[in-house]
């Protein structure tokens, strides 16, 4: 049964790519994307342009993140019950909603810039702890997700399983 599922979800050309080469490309793409985001948010600055659409993007971002979380949890439940194709569909959809979030986030911050935190007291170090861990893990999670997908679609299910056990909690956190 497992081999039949693997045959359905593997992509033949990915089987031909050596894992080290695939992971190298994943790391390169992820690194370039992270550098672009750092520049966009912290160095480029905002724009004077403002609209209702731009100001509504944080709500859309929250909706997309919540949707991704629910899809990831459904995907986890599906794989735990042996429904591998359902698991794959939930995770691919979670990836799409996460990508849409990232696009919306980039658009918002390209117009709005960064927002300084003005809170005081105990909440300030708590906020910065969450922010710093979020930034670090969000830089790490993209290559982790792409590696998980590569391993799954190239038929390396054992390694996919091991990588995904670490990837899922990080993805849920960020």
Sequence positions of predicted segments:
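Alpha-helical membrane insertion/targeting regions
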Residues: 2-174
């Amino acid at each position: 049964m497992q081999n039949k599922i693997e045959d359905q979800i593997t992509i033949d050309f990915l089987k031909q790519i050596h894992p080290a080469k695939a992971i190298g490309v994943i790391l390169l793409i992820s690194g370039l994307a992270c550098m672009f985001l750092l520049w966009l948010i912290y160095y480029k600055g905002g724009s004077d342009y403002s609209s209702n659409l731009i100001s509504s993007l944080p709500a859309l971002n929250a909706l997309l993140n919540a949707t991704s979380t629910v899809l990831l949890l459904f995907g986890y439940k599906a794989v735990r019950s042996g429904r591998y194709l359902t698991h794959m569909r939930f995770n691919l959809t979670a990836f799409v909603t996460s990508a849409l979030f990232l696009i919306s986030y980039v658009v918002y911050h390209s117009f709005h810039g960064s927002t300084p935190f003005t809170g005081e007291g105990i909440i300030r170090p708590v906020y910065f702890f969450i922010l710093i861990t979020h930034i670090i893990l969000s830089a790490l999670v993209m290559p982790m997700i792409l590696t998980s997908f590569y391993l799954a679609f190239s038929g390396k299910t054992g390694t996919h399983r091991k990588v995904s056990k670490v990837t899922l909690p990080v993805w849920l956190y960020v």
